[in-house]
Amino acid sequence: MRKRLRLADFGEDETLWLNGSGKPLFRPVEICWRDPVRIERDGSIALENEADVYKHGYLYALVRNHGNQATRNRIAYIGITNDLQKRFKNHPKVDQIRSMAGETSISVGVISTPGTRPSGTAMVQLREELEHILIWVLWDDLWNDRKTFVVPGQGGNGGRAWDISNTGFVFSGRMPKRIVFPWAAIEPRRNNTAR
């Protein structure tokens, strides 16, 4: 059934994706992924305290590298936290990933919203929405258990339309360069309008 689905054609001119006030229908947001830093066996991370950049918490991706793995920089887990230093001291899923042979590292995503400055509460909600969308998009290789069975935007907090650009570290091409969410997938019928 999925082979018949295709993306709905909203036109190639993205400047037409504006509302009546001339604002984008899909709110632009950029996630700049930092180079991964190794998570030590005890859960410590050699990250500087960048409280100004991360004052509303962290969006992160755990990355696995193992010598016998067929792929490099495999994204294993997407998450959010308010304190990176404490988060990995006792996190059952991360402990399980970290206990495997090979290296486990973390890449922190710095979120920016061109033209707007979300307040603390709005930034926390934005972080939650982005985490959910990334889990939904990257689900195939992830160890995440939560947020995999509910469509983003359908939970208790609702959701918004986003045009997400991922820059910085590219995870060997495994992180999509751009995610436009939500988008419509359609199964077209045979067109019988021609005479």
What are these regions (language model features)?
Residues M1-L59, V63-A76, N82-R195:
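Boundary/linker segments flanking structured domains
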